[in-house]
Each structure stands twice: as C-alpha cells, then as structure tokens.
A protein has these predicted regions:
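Helicase motor core with emphasis on the C-terminal RecA-like subdomain
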Residues: 1-111, 117, 155
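Intrinsically disordered, low-complexity sequence elements enriched in Ser/Thr/Gly/Pro
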Residues: 23, 74, 142, 183-184, ...
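Soluble or luminal CAZymes and related metallo-dependent hydrolases
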Residues: 24, 122-125, 129
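A general structural signal marking secondary-structure boundaries and capping sites
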Residues: 36, 137-140, 169
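Generic alpha-helical segment signature
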Residues: 63, 91, 123-126, 140
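A short, ordered amphipathic alpha-helix with a cationic face
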Residues: 87-89, 120-123, 133-136
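Accessory DNA-binding and partner-docking regions appended to nucleic-acid-acting proteins
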Residues: 96, 102, 108-118, 126-127, ...
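C-terminal accessory regions
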Residues: 126-158, 162-164
C-alpha cells in the first residue's frame, strides 16, 4: 500500500518483506542497491542489512520500540558523510498498541514463580525503553543531544541539524495540534460523530488502534 502510493507520486518504490518470493526479494534488493529503485518499503530486518552509503532518507512509518533500535536504523542514512534525514511518523496510538503487545507477549512466558518474575521484569524493561522513545518524539529540546546523552556522550552544538533546533515553535505547534486531534478523537470514540455514547468495549478498541500520524525528526 505504501509503496503503491509512493509510486503514484512519481517515485520508483517497491515493497520488500518476507511474504515475497525469494527471487522477487533479490530483484528488489538489486534494483534498490543499483539505484533503479529509489525507495524500498521494507521491514527493519531488510534495513539493518543495508550496506549502501548514499542513503539520503530513513523514514519510520511507526514509532521504533527503543532508542537503541532507532539510532541503529536512522544511522543507515548518510554513511557517505553527506547531509541526510531521519523521519519518524509518530502517533500516541502506536504507544498504546505496543504496550498491549508487550504485555500480551510477556504473559505467554513459562509457568512458575521464577518464570513469572522474569517475565514481569522483561515487560517492565521493554515498557521503560518504549517510554524513552516516546519522550524523544514528544520532547521540546534538542534531539541530537538527547541521543548523545543517552549513550553517555557530552553535549555538542547541534548547529540546527534537528527539527527542534531549526524551528522550536513549529515543533511546539505540531505537538499541540496532535494533542488537540487526540482529544477530538477521544470524544468521538466516547460519543460517536452524531453525539451518541458508544459502548465501553468500542471505546477501548478505537483507543488502541486508531492511527493519526504526526511527524518528528
């Protein structure tokens, strides 16, 4: 779907995922590596296998689950030293969905007190990592220095290489607009567009899976 939409805009794009035949995946990878395909719409696994230095953009269609993962994936852009961009399409609903999946997967661990203790500890760790990534996307401060400090480095002059340092007012407006949209959707989930109250089950479902997207670099 995403690759098709990009292609309609006049940019050559192809999907790359496990559902494709091996020969088709090889064709896409070869085409993208040679430059015939401008955009590969792919899974994280494909992205981490990239060894092409002239990547100009890495776009995350949804929120990465950890800062470490985001840093590795975004780092695939600009390995030739030239200016490049990392873009994240962030939605609060992504966070709700991931929290749900983390807890569901954690609850599938083995039985017994020790297994349950380890599962709970693992769930807490993953939720903390997710919260750090969410904070990165919603903060009102330099994103470059946030990453540097996360990995134990010292602050640097960003030189307007992140969206916040380039235009802090724009980032603030975007976050406020996203919050307002979320409030409107919450009201729609509770009462419906015609003003009638929905069932609690419907509210919970819509709250987890509706997905309006904002963006952060």
């Amino acid at each position: 779907m995403i690759a098709r939409a990009i292609s309609k805009a006049g940019i050559t794009a192809s999907p790359y995922h496990a559902g494709l035949k091996k020969a088709d995946r090889a064709t896409v990878q070869e085409g993208w590596s040679s430059g015939k395909i401008q955009v590969a719409v792919a899974t994280v696994a494909f992205g981490m296998g990239i060894d092409r230095h002239c990547v100009r953009y890495v776009v995350h269609w949804s929120l990465p689950k950890t800062i470490e993962g985001f840093y590795q994936e975004a780092g695939r852009a600009g390995r030739d030293g030239l200016p490049s961009h990392s873009l994240v399409f962030y939605s609060p609903e992504d966070v709700g969905k991931y929290k749900y999946l983390i807890r569901m997967q954690g609850n599938k661990s083995g039985k017994g007190a020790e297994a349950e203790r380890m599962a709970e500890k693992n769930i807490e760790r993953k939720l903390e990592q997710l919260e750090l990534m969410q904070d990165y996307c919603t903060q009102l401060k330099c994103r470059r220095n946030t990453l540097i400090k996360h990995f134990g480095g010292k602050s640097v002059n960003c030189q307007k290489t992140c969206d916040y340092c380039r235009n802090p007012k724009k980032v603030e407006r975007s976050l406020h607009a996203s919050s307002a949209i979320k409030d409107v959707r919450r009201q729609q989930n509770m009462f419906g567009k015609n003003g009638s109250r929905k069932s609690k089950g419907k509210q919970a479902w819509n709250g987890q899976w509706d997905k309006p997207h904002g963006d952060d670099e």
